[in-house]
């Protein structure tokens, strides 16, 4: 027995002697042996556990109390610093009562599928066990998946019932658009909580007459009054569970689990979990849609332990929950260990003072983490689901002291395969390595055989639900499962993970990179002769080995070459549209080329990857370690010394540390995006700057084209010395998960004197002669600029455009470039209209005083007659907290201008997406946004932050109208399409442009983009989009028609005209369209999608990055045909008709000319 094993044994003995809860949770060997006996059915197995441990605590979750706000009268939930538990007896009885209720009509019968959407909890576990009692098939849905990803699963499984947590009720209701079961059950529901009750009431109203909605409590109460339902008959081969997985690409596919496999979650002998024999007290944070979540939960219950659940699914309470639970088992994924590691460094950096003994402080902090955060009584630790770096493993084991960190390897399909690289016996029946010649891996390799690992296991899944074709692909002719992982066999039954067979590498943050394609991109650099991209799945970025060109060596010399090559790689990456995580963070310069002779090229001159990894792998891994150490040291130094250091140098160092550059490479005049930063790394920089300087720096400011690092430093200086501006934290609370319209009052944004004077200001000018326009470089904004220039020409007026830039001259140049798209008439028209009528100012609506000097701001306050505001930071990933500054506070800043000097009518461009959290029947054009959407969720769903930020702007405008009499017109736009007048003007990043390019570039389309009817025919459908010229004219015309009112328009195409995506393909194929396209239709949608994706991935880089590929998940299944508009447009259409807007004096239909224009414009821009 090793010293560590001896220490662990003594640790366990001490815990048995000193910790009553630990001792009371000791597993009963008789029960363990009984449930391991053959012939025991799954429901009987669970009954043995529940009755055998009847009086023990089975499940625990945080205690709650209900708190009523004295101002609003609304009741909410507050977490208490303790857990409440239910016993095994109570859990079994509760599940039985629920099963009885679910047996009543509409009854759930054996074999029925039931989808469950929610995070793991006592209620979730109750439902899961009830379904087992009924013989139903549980289909856990991923709460992180978008509705578009859930619908195909619901459609495929056709559930009899959907159970959803209250937090996911909105998504569940949306999912029902594809398949509507008879019953929807809501769990984790508290009737006293206003938001819970209102959500259920809204769902019932929306689904009235089609779906029965019950809360779990109502069903259990109903079940108590009914005769108990007997446990359903079961069979080992009966389907019991579907776990949906899609890997890195492809449509979701459901891995089938028979009852015998589900039993393996409960049995010690199955190999799913480590059979320690110690008490199991666990904190459960993994979802039930992941096999890891089920392993931990049911492994705990079968061991007679207590399974506690984290209080919040976003893990924001993880450390608090850990400290309260004091688990005996730490079953974490690498990301959780990363969080513990970050907490350690943060605490060490916080306490470290000059002259302190760092090693002693680190030991002290580790001891405190071990006892106070992790609870101090763990006896087992496991990591799995993704690779973990050797450095992190070593650090974790130093933290855990006497406990070894077990690294598990397995899959949804095969179960657990390896522990610490060793084959799990008897769970693994057989395995083999097969050669992968295209990657250079062979069983004859020395010193160890290498190849793809194929396995047979006791827990092997039988296949994917209703997907025999995909099932066949993952098994070889001998019945071995293809793991897709390249392994080296380093000893008997011992393996080391090397790579993915498809050479697509998953980085630690979950992003995938295709190394061969990146090598092709970076090989285009004139300074690069050869390049080998190297990645490690435990790291967030790749590295490289670069062989410089002969010219680069002779011109720069080896000693000066690295920064020059680094800059060249960044330039190539920008040109190819690469993401920051695809760019090598650092590289080794190799002056000896890769050749056939030195074994670093294959016979067909491809990179010999195994040999390259063997030759350079150790050096590259050392480079990873050096970079991590350097970054950690630099960030620690910045947190300690940054507050007292000059801002600009500190900012440059912070940007360099986060992006993996050297401070010498980061110039003050560099833009963050030019250094390889994106919106997510900008978010990390914003958080770091807040830690260093104690000020909020919005992501919008960091990524603004007007903000180089020097400008960012100026922003920080101003924020430190000046008056703090409104922020998400000051308005809603830094950690808010819900925001309220009542938070957004004008007095929090605008000084009292301005507000007091506003109602008595001179009325708006009778004639508009001076217009202030934001967002003129945007797609809609440029057309608004042309429209207003044309109108100002008639009245000898002026258009003032506010453009983000460092100077007025640069702002003018940015706006000029917007119109220079290859159409000489457009350029000439713009210049003629602008002569004497156009003023361009460098400014930003998100900045104090719009980023203008005081004299200029006052001039605008005195002279502007109308404000037109289409400007916004449009980002569908960033949270509301980061979009608050540019989109909400920026609107307030413009309102301050609108309410100074004289009242200036305000035209605001919003988005139809604000309606996503509003019941459809309430989402009308004349409703007050504060009334129909008083509270908004903050979550990580698609575009949640952007929609909330535009909602906030609407709320502020309503406030300004009500309090100050400000005329406001809001235009909620949906898809805005290209015009037919000008050449080259496209909104390249939008989904529709990407679709048109992709159809033309691949030459294939599905038989229909929509679901077919019962006879397999195309259905009538409608696509909601309007040409940008019409939208601009409508905004400019209607925006000035209501001088004293607050008016909202839904700018949408409302027609049931049968003009949809299928008709667009017809038009492209028509000889009369002039598109020059020939697009082949493929009847089978799945076949089209597969060929389409393959073709897109094979496109040249520039085309591929402009293609539909990043948004292809929206097309995984045929769309449900919609005829007409998703929101009412009566007010908008009546106003358009009355004002006779557009050629038709009405909302236009989409035409073949618009679709053909996309193709001609894409050709002009060199994308086709």
UniProtKB/Swiss-Prot annotation:
Annotated PROSITE patterns: AMP_BINDING, CARRIER
Binding site for AMP: 290, 385, 407-408, 412, 485, 497-500, 506, 606
Keywords associated with the record: ATP-binding, Fatty acid metabolism, Ligase, Lipid metabolism, NADP, Nucleotide-binding, Oxidoreductase, Phosphopantetheine, Phosphoprotein
Single GO BP term: biosynthetic process
EC number annotated for this UniProt entry: 1.2.1.-, 6.2.1.-
Single GO cellular component term: cytosol
One matching Pfam family: PP-binding
Task performed by this protein: Catalyzes the ATP- and NADPH-dependent reduction of carboxylic acids to the corresponding aldehydes. In vitro, also catalyzes the activation of medium/long-chain fatty acids as acyl-adenylates (acyl-AMP).
Protein name in UniProt: Carboxylic acid reductase
Annotated organism of origin: Mycobacterium tuberculosis (strain ATCC 25618 / H37Rv)
Gene: car
């Amino acid at each position: 027995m090793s010293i560590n094993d001896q220490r662990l044994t003594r640790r366990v003995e001490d815990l048995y002697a000193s910790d009553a809860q630990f001792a009371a949770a000791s597993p009963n060997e008789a029960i363990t042996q009984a449930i391991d006996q053959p012939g025991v059915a799954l429901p009987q197995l669970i009954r043995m556990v529940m009755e055998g441990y009847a009086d023990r605590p089975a499940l625990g979750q945080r205690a709650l109390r209900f708190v009523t706000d004295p101002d609003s009268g609304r009741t909410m939930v507050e977490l208490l610093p303790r857990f409440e538990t239910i016993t095994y007896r109570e859990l079994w009885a509760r599940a039985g009562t629920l099963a009885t209720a679910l047996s009543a009509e509409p009854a759930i019968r054996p074999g029925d599928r039931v989808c469950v959407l929610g995070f793991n909890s006592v209620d979730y576990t109750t439902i899961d066990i009830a379904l087992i009692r009924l013989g139903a098939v549980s289909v856990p849905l991923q709460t992180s998946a978008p509705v578009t990803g859930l619908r195909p699963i619901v459609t495929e499984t056709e559930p009899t019932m959907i159970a959803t947590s209250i937090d996911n009720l909105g998504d569940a209701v949306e999912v029902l658009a594809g398949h509507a079961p008879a019953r929807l059950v809501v769990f984790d529901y508290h009737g006293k909580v206003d938001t819970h009750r209102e959500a259920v009431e809204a769902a019932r109203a929306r689904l009235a007459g089609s779906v029965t909605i019950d809360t779990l409590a109502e069903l259990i109460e109903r079940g108590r009054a009914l005769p108990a339902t007997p446990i359903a008959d079961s069979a080992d081969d009966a389907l019991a569970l579907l776990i949906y997985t899609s890997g890195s690409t492809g449509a979701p596919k459901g891995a089938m689990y028979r009852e015998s496999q589900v039993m393996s979650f409960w049995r010690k002998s199955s190999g799913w979990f480590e059979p320690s024999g110690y008490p199991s007290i666990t904190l459960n944070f993994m979802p039930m849609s992941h096999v890891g979540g089920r392993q931990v939960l049911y492994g705990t219950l079968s061991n007679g332990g207590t399974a506690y659940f984290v209080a919040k699914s976003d893990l924001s309470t993880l450390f608090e929950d850990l400290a309260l639970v004091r688990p005996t088992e730490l079953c974490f994924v690498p990301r959780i260990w990363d969080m513990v590691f970050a907490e350690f460094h943060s605490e060490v950096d916080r306490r470290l003072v000059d002259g302190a003994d760092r090693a002693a402080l680190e030991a002290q902090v580790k001891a405190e983490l071990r006892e106070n955060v992790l609870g101090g009584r763990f006896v087992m630790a496991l990591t799995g689901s993704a690779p973990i770096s050797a450095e992190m493993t070593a650090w974790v084991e130093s933290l855990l002291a006497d406990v070894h960190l077990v690294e598990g390897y397995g899959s949804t399909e095969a179960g657990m395969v390896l522990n610490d690289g060793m084959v799990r016996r008897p769970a693994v029946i057989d395995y083999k390595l097969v050669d992968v010649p295209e990657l250079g891996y062979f069983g004859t390799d020395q010193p160890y055989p290498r190849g793809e690992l194929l396995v047979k296991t006791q827990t092997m899944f039988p296949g994917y639900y209703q997907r025999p074709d995909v099932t066949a692909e993952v098994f070889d002719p001998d019945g071995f499962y293809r793991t897709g992982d390249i392994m080296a066999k380093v000893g008997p039954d011992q393996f080391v993970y090397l790579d993915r067979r498809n050479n697509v590498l998953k980085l630690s943050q979950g992003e995938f990179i295709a190394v061969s394609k990146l090598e092709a991109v970076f090989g285009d650099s004139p300074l690069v002769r050869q390049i080998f991209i190297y990645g490690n799945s435990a790291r967030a970025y790749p590295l490289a080995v670069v062989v410089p060109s002969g010219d680069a060596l002779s011109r720069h010399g080896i000693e000066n070459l690295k920064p020059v090559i680094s800059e060249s790689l960044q330039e190539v990456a920008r040109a190819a549209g690469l993401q920051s995580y695809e760019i090598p963070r650092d590289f080794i310069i190799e002056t000896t080329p890769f050749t056939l002779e030195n074994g670093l090229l294959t016979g067909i001159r491809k990179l010999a990857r195994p040999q390259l990894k063997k030759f350079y792998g150790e050096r590259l891994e050392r480079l990873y370690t050096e970079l991590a150490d350097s970054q950690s040291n630099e960030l620690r130094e910045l947190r300690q010394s940054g507050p007292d250091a000059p801002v600009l140098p500190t900012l440059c160092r912070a940007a360099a540390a986060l992006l993996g550059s050297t401070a010498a490479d980061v110039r003050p005049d560099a833009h963050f995006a030019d250094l390889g930063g994106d919106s997510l790394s900008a978010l990390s920089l914003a958080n770091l700057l807040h830690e260093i300087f104690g000020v909020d720096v919005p992501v919008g400011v960091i990524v603004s084209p007007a903000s180089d690092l020097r400008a960012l430093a100026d922003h920080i200086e101003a924020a430190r010395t000046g008056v703090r501006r409104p922020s998400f934290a000051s308005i809603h609370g830094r950690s808010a998960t819900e925001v309220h319209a009542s938070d957004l009052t004008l007095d929090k944004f605008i000084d009292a004197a301005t507000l007091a004077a506003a109602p008595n200001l001179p009325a708006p000018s009778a004639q508009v002669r001076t217009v202030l326009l934001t967002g003129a470089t945007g797609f809609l904004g440029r057309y608004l600029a042309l429209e207003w220039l044309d109108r100002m020409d008639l009245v000898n007026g002026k258009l003032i455009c506010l453009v983000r830039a460092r100077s007025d001259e640069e702002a003018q140049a940015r706006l000029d470039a917007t119109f220079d798209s290859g159409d000489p008439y457009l350029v000439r028209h713009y210049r003629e209209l602008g002569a004497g009528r156009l003023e361009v100012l460098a400014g930003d609506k998100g900045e104090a005083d719009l980023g203008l000097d005081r004299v200029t701001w006052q001039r605008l306050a005195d002279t502007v007659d109308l404000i037109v505001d289409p400007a916004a930071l449009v980002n569908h990933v960033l949270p509301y907290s980061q979009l608050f500054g540019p989109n909400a506070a920026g609107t307030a800043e413009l309102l301050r201008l609108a309410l100074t000097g004289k009242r200036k009518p305000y035209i605001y461009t919003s988005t139809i997406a604000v309606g996503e959290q509003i019941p459809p029947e309430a989402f009308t054009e004349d409703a007050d946004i504060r009334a129909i959407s008083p509270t908004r969720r903050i979550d990580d769903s698609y575009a949640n932050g952007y929609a909330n930020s535009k909602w906030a702007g609407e709320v502020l405008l309503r406030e300004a109208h009500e309090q100050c009499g400000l005329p406001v017109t809001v235009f909620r736009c949906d898809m805005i399409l290209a015009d037919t007048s000008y050449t080259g003007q496209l909104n390249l990043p939008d989904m529709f442009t990407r679709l048109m390019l992709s159809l033309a570039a691949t030459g294939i389309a599905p038989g229909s983009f929509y679901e077919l009817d019962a006879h397999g025919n195309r259905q009538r459908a409608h696509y909601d989009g309007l040409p940008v010229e019409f939208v601009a004219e409508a905004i400019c015309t209607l925006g000035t028609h209501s001088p004293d009112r607050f008016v909202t328009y839904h700018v949408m195409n409302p027609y049931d005209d049968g003009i949809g995506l299928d008709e667009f393909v017809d038009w492209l194929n028509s000889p009369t369209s002039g598109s020059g396209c020939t697009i082949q239709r493929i009847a089978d949608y799945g076949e089209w999608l597969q060929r389409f994706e393959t073709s897109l991935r094979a496109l040249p880089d520039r085309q591929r990055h402009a293609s539909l590929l990043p948004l292809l998940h929206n097309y995984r299944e045929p769309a449900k045909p919609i005829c007409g508009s998703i929101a009412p447009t009566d007010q908008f259409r009546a106003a358009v008709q009355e004002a006779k807007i557009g050629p038709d004096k009405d909302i236009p239909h989409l035409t073949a000319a618009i679709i053909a224009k996309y193709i001609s414009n894409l050709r002009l821009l060199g994308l086709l």
